[in-house]
UniProtKB/Swiss-Prot annotation:
Taxonomic lineage of the native organism: Bacteria, Pseudomonadati, Pseudomonadota, Betaproteobacteria, Burkholderiales
Any single Gene Ontology cellular-component annotation: cytosol
Enzyme nomenclature, EC number: 2.5.1.78
Family: Belongs to the DMRL synthase family.
Pathway(s) annotated for this protein in UniProt: Cofactor biosynthesis; riboflavin biosynthesis; riboflavin from 2-hydroxy-3-oxobutyl phosphate and 5-amino-6-(D-ribitylamino)uracil: step 1/2
UniProt protein name: 6,7-dimethyl-8-ribityllumazine synthase
């Protein structure tokens, strides 16, 4: 049996991408952002189609993402941050709440969000992961923006088929 299959599309030309970057653990977050922006450019996203905003910490990321999503100007969003374990429960709170908020915004607004908020045990782990995670966030944003647009067209095609059937009746 042959089945239809969507092939991943990493062509970024014409896509509008919003990035929200935490300033807490700034060296790591700057490394994430540098790698992400470099990869977006490699994928064909124009610098004029990227907006980067910064927020104090990971817990503020969801609100900024929500504001960008509400604008309707973006094909995908990216969350960048670093939560590094300390000696208190705060690590779990920030990790869980920021992640849940990021996911909720994407689902509420039907908008892809690449979550590149690192959660690590120490600074060394964060530094070791920042470059590849930044690049990965760019690839996820571009691929998911293209996928959601392609899937949205499926709905448009079904509406056209229904309109054709009504015209024939």
């Amino acid at each position: 049996m042959e089945i239809g299959q969507y092939q991943p599309n990493l062509e970024g030309d014409g896509l509008r991408i919003g990035i929200v970057q935490s300033r807490f653990n700034e060296p790591v977050c700057n490394g994430l952002a540098d790698a992400c922006v470099e990869e977006l450019e490699r994928l064909g996203v124009s610098g004029e189609d990227v907006l980067l905003v910064s927020v104090p910490g990971a817990l503020e990321i969801p609100l900024a993402l929500q504001k960008l999503a509400e604008s309707g100007q973006f094909d995908a969003l990216i969350a960048l941050g670093a939560v590094i374990r300390g000696e208190t429960y705060h690590f779990e709170l920030v990790s869980n709440e920021s992640g849940a908020g990021i996911t909720r915004i994407g689902l509420d607004f039907n908008l892809p969000i690449a979550n590149a908020v690192l959660t690590t045990e120490n600074d060394e782990q964060a530094v070791a992961r920042m470059t590849e995670k930044g690049r990965d966030a760019a690839r996820v944003a571009v691929e998911m923006a293209n996928l959601t647009m392609a899937l949205d067209q499926l709905g448009d095609d079904e509406e056209e088929d229904e309109d054709d059937e009504e015209e024939r009746a």
